[in-house]
């Protein structure tokens, strides 16, 4: 992954991210509900890839006595998250710029992350390392099957779609079985009146870094595959695992 490009694009999108990140908000809410149902009491939480704070705010409300360490690769995202916190929330939240692949779980009750791990080079290796450090994990990540409609349109035209490779469901299931984790997978969808609206929305949230070596396809050709708009699928995996 080109971390500098990812950081720059998400940072540039921070000011308008929440206007377009509808799926991200839903996934964060669903993850937060699962976290609180499983672990009603937490004291110290590390959040990786907090973005503008969709999961952050759920955690702060659910655990009013907890200390939260919110981290993100993009400083502008951290600033956007800070700007929406109350004085009480700021008093018990630490904000740090951090690459999730270098995170340390020691001293935390829980490491949580919502829709950030798909940007890591080796997400399951990071999960294994953090879990071995003694923390519980609660991760929501996009998996294979995401953007299936967009990818199929490219395939039908013999074009490369440029979508980053997502984790396969089988890989996640094997990891979950090995570590005694609970795995839940759901499909969320979003409908756009025109296919170009989907392309623009992805850019507006900063999630348009392509797969390495990708050469952009003729966009007009792809858009003509969707004369009546497009409904896009997001396959979201929720992984919850107890501490060792």
Pin down the residues of each PLM region.
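N-terminal, positively charged/glycine-rich alpha-helical extensions of SAM-dependent methyltransferases
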Residues: 1-15
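Conserved alpha-helix/loop element of class I SAM-dependent methyltransferases that forms part
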Residues: 22-41
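Class I SAM-dependent methyltransferase SAM/SAH-binding core
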Residues: 46-102
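Conserved Class I S-adenosyl-L-methionine
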Residues: 52-54, 182-244
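A short glycine-rich, Lys/Arg-flanked "PGG" loop and its adjoining helix->strand segment in the class I
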Residues: 124-136
